[in-house]
Amino acid sequence: MRLSWFRVLTVLSICLSAVATATGAEGKRKLQIGVKKRVDHCPIKSRKGDVLHMHYTGKLEDGTEFDSSLPQNQPFVFSLGTGQVIKGWDQGLLGMCEGEKRKLVIPSELGYGERGAPPKIPGGATLVFEVELLKIERRTEL
């Protein structure tokens, strides 16, 4: 019996460690960035102030799609790192190459927070984005 309890406690401590790692020290989940497609030639990488042309599909954790640029074949264009998009994008799209694809898993704190963006995005929602960087417009400093 003693051995069984030891196993249970070991498994429990491993599970709690995994949860603590995934949520971070303060109980908040962290931004997850996965590279889905790399490019062989990358002369410039995205940085703060660049104008990015992106294709994207946004989903909730359960797979419900809430937005996409693909049906209209109209890229979304914005300036990186200037607050024009959610914080998860400003952070998760840094250092990308043209043609690269990423999957971003964005906790609500870096998305739309507890308020959400009704009616499609509920409060506290974790967002999952598949993104592709089509073009970088580098802004020269004045």
Curated annotation (Swiss-Prot):
Residues 49-137 form the PPIase FKBP-type domain. GO terms for cellular component: endoplasmic reticulum; endoplasmic reticulum membrane. It is a peripheral membrane protein. T-cells and thymus. A motif (Prevents secretion from ER) lies at residues 139-142. Residues 1-21 form the signal peptide. It is found in: Endoplasmic reticulum membrane. Keywords: Endoplasmic reticulum, Isomerase, Membrane, Rotamase, Signal. Disulfide bonds: none annotated. One of its GO terms (biological process) is chaperone-mediated protein folding. Its main location: endoplasmic reticulum. Belongs to the FKBP-type PPIase family. FKBP2 subfamily. PPIases accelerate the folding of proteins. It catalyzes the cis-trans isomerization of proline imidic peptide bonds in oligopeptides. Interacts with ARFGEF1/BIG1 and the C-terminal of EPB41L2. PANTHER family: PEPTIDYL-PROLYL CIS-TRANS ISOMERASE FKBP2 (PTHR45779:SF3), PEPTIDYLPROLYL ISOMERASE (PTHR45779). This is Peptidyl-prolyl cis-trans isomerase FKBP2. It comes from Homo sapiens.
